[in-house]
A protein has these predicted regions:
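Nucleic-acid endo/exonuclease domains
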Residues: 1-141
Length: 141
């Protein structure tokens, strides 16, 4: 079975009824999640390892749907999520330094906070310098 691209799937969902729309969005999200999980960055893998050593259970590449009137309008896939405590950790690479990406990150963070999540951001460089241990300690103690 040939895999469809995310763009192909997005084109298919236009004009669908809510149930069909949500099913199509779910399909897109799962594919995107899978790709992100398979291609985690070295900094993300290091952060995950440190959290595991500290006994902190985090879901990797976790999807959060943004709904309006029960219809999925968009979704975010966050790097790490403590689903019990509603805590999100984002490991930011260099592309997060661009003004355009910073604006996207700002609105994404606001959406997630509106849903009750606490969002913590840490750069790749900070992970490599060992600051993820300090961040996890600060959040969980």
């Amino acid at each position: 079975m040939k895999r469809r691209s995310i763009k192909d799937l997005e084109a298919e969902i236009k004009g669908l009824k809510r149930k069909q729309h949500n099913k199509a969005m779910d399909s897109i999200a799962k594919e995107f999640q899978r790709k992100l999980y398979e291609n985690m960055t070295p900094a993300e893998l290091k952060f995950k390892h440190i959290a595991e050593l500290k006994g902190i259970k985090l879901e990797c590449q976790y999807r959060i749907n943004i709904k309006y009137k029960k219809e999925i309008k968009r979704f975010y896939i966050v790097d790490f999520c403590d689903t019990i405590n509603k805590i999100i950790f984002e490991v930011d690479g260099d592309y997060h330094n661009t003004l355009e990406q910073q604006k996207k990150d700002y609105y994404r963070t606001k959406d997630l906070q509106h849903l009750g999540y606490k969002v913590y951001r840490i750069t790749n460089e900070q992970v490599y310098k060992g600051l993820s241990t300090a961040l996890l300690y600060k959040v969980y103690h």
